[in-house]
Curated annotation (Swiss-Prot):
Gene3D superfamilies: 1.20.5.300. Belongs to the SlyX family. PANTHER family: PROTEIN SLYX. It comes from Rhodopseudomonas palustris (strain TIE-1). This is Protein SlyX homolog.
Amino acid sequence: MAGENDLNDRVEALEVRLAYQDETIEALNQTVTAQWKQIDALTRQLAALSERLDQAESSAGAPANERPPHY
């Protein structure tokens, strides 16, 4: 009987650990999903800013050979 109780206690302890691990995995999954959404949004924002910078550089043209205002 003592061995059977010990086995039941061990199984119960494993079930508790498994339940906590499932909760942890779910929390980590939610965190990773949120981070990927943020990374995706930041990537799109960076691409848009890069395009705006390219457009600004191309529309500005070459700098004129003018003297600076302090001359």
